[in-house]
Amino acid sequence: TQEIAEWTKQYDPSRLVNPASGGNHYQCGDMLDLHKYPAPEMYLYDAQRPTVLGEYGGIGLVLKDHLWEPNRNWGYVQFNSSKEATDEYVKYAEMLYNMVVKGFSGAVYTQTTDVEIEVNGLMTYDRKVVKLDEKRVREINQRICNSLNK
């Protein structure tokens, strides 16, 4: 990992290098990338590099007639309505907001769309339905982004 991260940085110093997304952390690269499901959490810190959450979330919501396989569906946590799933997303986003003051630098929600048997997406597998309340998601995401400018 360290050798590849150093080679990559030397090859193209203009790009950020993420040496290991989610595990096998070494003192190299431009960031420390953690994975935590379902709720976000910073459990490691590095004084030399920003800490990011490369994966979190996994909020499951099954929407009939928009599934890859109707009888096998999975999410880290399962909800029965868009409101419940959106409430959980907002709860996690509030946690991210509170982590900014502790040095938190970025996050990637898993995942943008449902894939095969995973129903964790913000949209359905067929991309026909946005599963969460777009207005509430946009508002909380903008609140987090704006807090990074302070």
Regions found by a protein language model. Name each.
Residues 1-31, 48, 91:
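Active-site neighborhood of glycoside hydrolase catalytic domains
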Residues 18, 37-40, 91-94:
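Short alpha-helical segments and helix-capping/turn motifs at coil-helix boundaries
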